[in-house]
């Protein structure tokens, strides 16, 4: 960047979580460089910060092996056109946010063309397919890690990396009052609630909701005072879930708020959820949880051969030990999930919540500002 020219920064995000990270980073950079320009791919939050997306971010939000194959021609065309566009624009630095299968190739081609590259959100290379580190080193000048143990992995492989903390730890308050959340959601103030979070994607809900609803039926018999609430990401997913409730749990009294997942978790006493970022949100909101997940059978055959981390849920990975029950595939039976939830309901959870607070404090280090510090070093 010439000292007389405002920085031009390329950012490529592939899904909602990346859009959130990108918007926070753009805000932090713009405070230092009000005239900075941003190019690349982003969603609505990044658009609010001035990103004119090269193509729709949703085109990259493809999950599952079968789905990726179906969309492969479009993805390859997007990638080729994006690389050509970014090389022609010559940004001062390119930041790929998550979406490693797409972004690492883009980053490698830009780095070869002499453009500095940063990857924001470490690929889970520490958990499976460790051999990918060779490709990452060829593609990336610096990795921004959300989790503290990830930096140790990159240090071992001599790739510059910075632990920037997790933006969710900055966004979610250290104490989220249950009473306040219930009032805002118009839930009953003095009864016990179990929040059910079966995923945000259509396929996940189809796979997990029937299991979770059958567990809810059994818990309703055991605890007549227990109430149920299931936040949905959209009206379409709420309609899908309602059909499954009618099929599997027609007698169940369950509320389905749309777009209020964090508030619902704060309002609940206990949580039953799938793996992923939602488990980290649950930890930060500090509610006892059971994590259960069933993968598509083909995905599971691949994962079980390549996955080598001791846990699959973020709370346990961050703690370095099992602090929340996690049940996967055949272990995620209705009986096992019910038993884990009963134990959670019957036990004293204060020691668990103290561990959640300790982890929250470790992750709360102003992620967007620390990430912007690294970007600044490349300008």
UniProtKB/Swiss-Prot annotation:
SUPFAM superfamilies membership: UDP-Glycosyltransferase/glycogen phosphorylase
Disulphide linkage map: none
Gene Ontology, cellular component aspect: membrane
InterPro entries membership: Glyco_trans_19
The keyword Lipid metabolism appears for this protein: yes
UniProt cross-references to Pfam families, sorted A to Z: LpxB
UniProt catalytic activity: a lipid X + a UDP-2-N,3-O-bis[(3R)-3-hydroxyacyl]-alpha-D-glucosamine = a lipid A disaccharide + UDP + H(+)
GO biological process: one example: lipid A biosynthetic process
Enzyme's top EC category: transferase
Known pathway: Bacterial outer membrane biogenesis; LPS lipid A biosynthesis
EC number: 2.4.1.182
Keyword Lipid biosynthesis: yes
Function: Condensation of UDP-2,3-diacylglucosamine and 2,3-diacylglucosamine-1-phosphate to form lipid A disaccharide, a precursor of lipid A, a phosphorylated glycolipid that anchors the lipopolysaccharide to the outer membrane of the cell.
Family: Belongs to the LpxB family.
The protein, known as: Lipid-A-disaccharide synthase
Organism this protein belongs to: Idiomarina loihiensis (strain ATCC BAA-735 / DSM 15497 / L2-TR)
Organism taxonomic ancestry: Bacteria, Pseudomonadati, Pseudomonadota, Gammaproteobacteria, Alteromonadales
């Amino acid at each position: 960047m010439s000292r007389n020219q405002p920085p031009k920064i390329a950012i490529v995000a592939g899904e909602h979580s990346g859009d959130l990270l990108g918007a926070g980073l753009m805000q932090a950079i713009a405070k230092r460089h009000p005239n900075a320009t941003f190019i690349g791919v982003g969603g609505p939050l990044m658009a609010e910060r001035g990103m004119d997306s090269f193509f729709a971010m949703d085109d990259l939000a493809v999950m599952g092996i079968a789905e990726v194959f179906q969309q492969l021609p479009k993805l390859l065309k997007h990638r080729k056109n994006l690389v050509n566009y970014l090389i022609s624009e010559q940004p001062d630095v390119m930041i790929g946010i998550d979406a490693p299968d797409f972004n690492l190739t883009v980053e490698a081609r830009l780095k070869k063309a002499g453009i500095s590259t940063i990857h924001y959100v470490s690929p889970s290379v520490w958990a499976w397919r460790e051999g990918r580190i060779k490709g990452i080193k060829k593609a990336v000048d610096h990795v921004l890690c959300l989790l503290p143990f990830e930096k140790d992995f990159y240090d071992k492989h001599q790739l510059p990396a910075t632990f920037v903390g997790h933006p969710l730890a900055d966004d979610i308050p250290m104490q989220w009052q249950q009473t306040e959340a219930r009032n805002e959601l118009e839930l009953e103030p003095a009864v016990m609630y179990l929040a059910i979070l079966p995923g945000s994607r259509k396929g996940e809900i189809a796979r997990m909701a029937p299991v979770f609803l059958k567990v809810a039926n059994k818990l309703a018999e055991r605890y007549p005072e227990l109430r149920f609430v299931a936040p949905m990401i959209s009206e379409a997913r709420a309609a899908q879930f309602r059909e499954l409730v009618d099929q599997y749990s027609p007698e169940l009294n369950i509320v389905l708020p749309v777009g209020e997942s964090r508030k619902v978790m704060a309002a609940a006493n206990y949580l039953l959820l799938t793996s992923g970022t939602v488990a980290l949100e649950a930890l930060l909101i500090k509610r006892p949880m059971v994590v259960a997940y069933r993968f598509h059978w083909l995905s599971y055959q691949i994962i079980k051969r390549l996955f080598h981390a001791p846990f699959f849920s973020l709370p346990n990975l961050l703690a370095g030990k099992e602090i929340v029950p996690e049940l996967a595939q055949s272990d995620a039976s209705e009986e096992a999930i019910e038993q884990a939830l009963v134990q959670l309901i019957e036990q004293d959870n204060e020691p668990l919540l103290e561990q959640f607070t300790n982890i929250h404090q470790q992750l709360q280090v102003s992620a967007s500002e620390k990430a912007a510090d690294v970007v600044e070093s490349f300008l």
